[in-house]
């Protein structure tokens, strides 16, 4: 071999040094995304003096194959395929200095069926990148070929309704309060009262695990005694979300097996356990015919601010792939952050077989879920019977409405609080099915029902005027057009 000739060819193909990301091929304004590409929409805030196109190219580069300098080993790979490509940059409406940048990733960059691998690329590095003041992942689109590598929810909405034999209306639940401090026996008493009064589910809260005042095994035993007694007395299938979140997967599996042995139909985990753990426990639930409830504990640390972090609609998409049956998605009218249209977008991501572009609700891409099962959204946090017409109008039937304080704080007791919520729901569903305008007539419908139900009357007298009217920090930004109507 002619060494000299080889060296010359090497120099022609490779030159050491630092190039702009756009020059390295991470920007292509003419690129047309393929059906098999993974697409991501970032909201970026470049540092002063940084060109938005270069910033977008940097996001594409640092979330795929690039590093800060040219490396000769690029020539050992199919660079043109492996490079992510920023293909569109546009100013965020009404927000100077911020830009939407669209990035396409070849499917070959991702391991099949692994949220951990997906997130390591998409959010693993770019959010600390110095040329950006801030960055937020607003939305994603997954090709059908990629969606098919995931198993999705172990039970799904249809399977859960068939198992519970409950159709045509939302499910009702409540979180046991206070979150911490009750003994196992008193905890079970709360669960029994709520279920006996008319709720479908009671639940553990995110931070009740196994503390000195109540060991997890005691809680499970007393809770399932309450569930079985309430089920026998009402003739309805009842349940309680037993939180199996623990410090290790081995301990989580141990708690899940014990819950199953007691006859529980559902277990719960917190988002903070991580995506690998979530996918692992989802697989266990699939194998053991259990419903998996997901509490989104901790999400607000990175989903709430508009300029930096991850939109919850993306988290919802990841969790549908990962395989949860229930997911807390906000209430819009309760105590927690949530613009009504934006929250409806989260629900649509969970429940629809195909998402169309819906800019007012923050959905920027079409998404075909390829027959992946649907996730049941959960509305929880500061809601009460007086808001039943708003909740039913906003979210429809496929939702779990959880009234924690609105059940356990009832002036006539826990069972009365549950009855108030059940009567309010039944009255509102009946009125809706009769063709009445529940948005307008809701308060009147509730008061009419309260004439025959003292617990509902007491609930309306106690909380009827309670609202949480704060401006949402996370709303959708888009340019209104004739085809994008509010």
UniProtKB/Swiss-Prot annotation:
Keyword check for Metal-binding: yes
Classification via InterPro entries: RuBisCO (IPR033966), RuBisCo_large_chain_AS (IPR020878), RuBisCO_lsu_C (IPR000685), RuBisCO_lsu_C_sf (IPR036376), RuBisCO_lsu_fd_N (IPR017443), RuBisCO_lsu_N_sf (IPR036422), RuBisCO_lsuI (IPR020888)
Binding, Mg(2+): 203, 205-206
Entry's cofactor comment: Binds 1 Mg(2+) ion per subunit.
Record lineage: Bacteria, Pseudomonadati, Pseudomonadota, Alphaproteobacteria, Rhodobacterales
Encoding gene per record: cbbL
Residues annotated for substrate binding in this entry: 125, 175, 179, 296, 328, 380
Biological processes, Gene Ontology terms: reductive pentose-phosphate cycle
Location of N6-carboxylysine modifications: 203
Name of the protein: Ribulose bisphosphate carboxylase large chain
Annotated GO MF terms: magnesium ion binding; monooxygenase activity; ribulose-bisphosphate carboxylase activity
Segments passing through the bilayer: none
Subunit structure: Heterohexadecamer of 8 large chains and 8 small chains.
Pfam family of the protein (one): RuBisCO_large
Its EC number(s): 4.1.1.39
Induction context: Expression of this operon predominates when carbon dioxide is limiting.
Keywords noted in UniProt: Calvin cycle, Carbon dioxide fixation, Lyase, Magnesium, Metal-binding, Monooxygenase, Oxidoreductase, Photosynthesis
Annotated site, Transition state stabilizer, chain positions: 335
Highest taxon above the source species: Bacteria
SUPFAM superfamilies listed in its UniProt record: RuBisCo, C-terminal domain, RuBisCO, large subunit, small (N-terminal) domain
Names of the cofactor(s): Mg(2+)
Record keyword Transmembrane helix present: no
Function: RuBisCO catalyzes two reactions: the carboxylation of D-ribulose 1,5-bisphosphate, the primary event in carbon dioxide fixation, as well as the oxidative fragmentation of the pentose substrate. Both reactions occur simultaneously and in competition at the same active site.
Other remarks in the entry: The basic functional RuBisCO is composed of a large chain homodimer in a 'head-to-tail' conformation. In form I RuBisCO this homodimer is arranged in a barrel-like tetramer with the small subunits forming a tetrameric 'cap' on each end of the 'barrel'.
Reactions catalysed, as given in the entry: 2 (2R)-3-phosphoglycerate + 2 H(+) = D-ribulose 1,5-bisphosphate + CO2 + H2O; D-ribulose 1,5-bisphosphate + O2 = 2-phosphoglycolate + (2R)-3-phosphoglycerate + 2 H(+)
Catalytic residues identified in the record: 177 (proton acceptor), 295 (proton acceptor)
């Amino acid at each position: 071999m002619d060494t000299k000739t080889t060296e010359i060819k090497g120099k022609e193909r490779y030159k050491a040094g630092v190039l702009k990301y756009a020059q390295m091929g991470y920007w292509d304004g003419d690129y047309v995304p393929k059906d098999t590409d993974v697409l991501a929409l970032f909201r970026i805030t470049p540092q002063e003096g940084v060109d938005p196109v270069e910033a977008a190219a940097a996001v594409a580069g640092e979330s795929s194959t690039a590093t800060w300098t040219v490396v000769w080993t690029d020539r050992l790979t199919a660079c043109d395929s492996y490079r992510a490509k920023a293909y569109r940059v546009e100013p965020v409406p009404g927000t100077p200095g911020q830009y939407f940048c669209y990035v396409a990733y070849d499917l070959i960059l991702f391991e099949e069926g692994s949220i951990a691998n997906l997130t390591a690329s998409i959010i693993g590095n770019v959010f600390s990148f110095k040329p950006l003041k801030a960055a937020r992942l607003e939305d994603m689109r997954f090709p059908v070929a990629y969606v098919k590598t995931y198993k999705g929810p172990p039970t799904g909405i249809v399977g859960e309704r068939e198992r519970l034999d409950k159709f045509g209306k939302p499910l009702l639940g409540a979180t046991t309060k206070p979150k911490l401090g009750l003994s196992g026996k008193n905890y079970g008493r709360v669960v029994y009262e709520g279920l006996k009064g008319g709720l479908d589910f009671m639940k553990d809260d995110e931070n009740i695990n196994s503390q000195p005042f109540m060991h997890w095994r005691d809680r499970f035993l007393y809770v399932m005694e309450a569930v079985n007694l309430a089920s026998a007395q009402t003739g309805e299938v009842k349940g309680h979300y037993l939180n199996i979140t623990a410090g290790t997967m081995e301990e989580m599996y141990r708690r899940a097996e014990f819950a199953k042995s007691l006859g529980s139909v559902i277990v719960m985990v917190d988002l903070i356990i991580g995506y690998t753990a979530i996918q692992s426990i989802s697989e266990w639930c699939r194998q053991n015919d259990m419903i998996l409830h997901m509490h989104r504990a901790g999400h607000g640390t990175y989903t709430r601010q508009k300029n930096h972090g991850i939109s919850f609609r993306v988290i919802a998409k990841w969790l549908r792939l990962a395989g949860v049956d229930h997911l807390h998605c906000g209430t819009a009218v309760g105590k927690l952050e949530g613009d009504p249209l934006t929250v409806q977008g989260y629900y649509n991501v969970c429940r629809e077989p195909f998402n169309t572009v819906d800019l007012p609700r923050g959905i920027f891409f079409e998404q075909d879920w390829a027959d992946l099962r649907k996730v049941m959204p959960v509305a929880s946090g500061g809601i009460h019977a007086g808001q039943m017409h708003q909740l039913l109008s906003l979210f429809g039937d496929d939702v779990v409405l959880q009234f924690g304080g609105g059940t356990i704080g009832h002036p006539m007791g826990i069972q009365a609080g549950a009855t108030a919520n059940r009567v309010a729901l039944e009255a509102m569903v009946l009125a809706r099915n009769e063709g009445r305008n529940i948005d307008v007539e809701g308060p009147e419908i509730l008061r009419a029902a309260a004439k025959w139900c003292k617990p509902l009357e007491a609930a309306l007298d106690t909380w009827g005027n309670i609202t949480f009217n704060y401006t949402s920090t996370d709303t959708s930004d888009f340019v209104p057009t004739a085809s994008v109507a509010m």
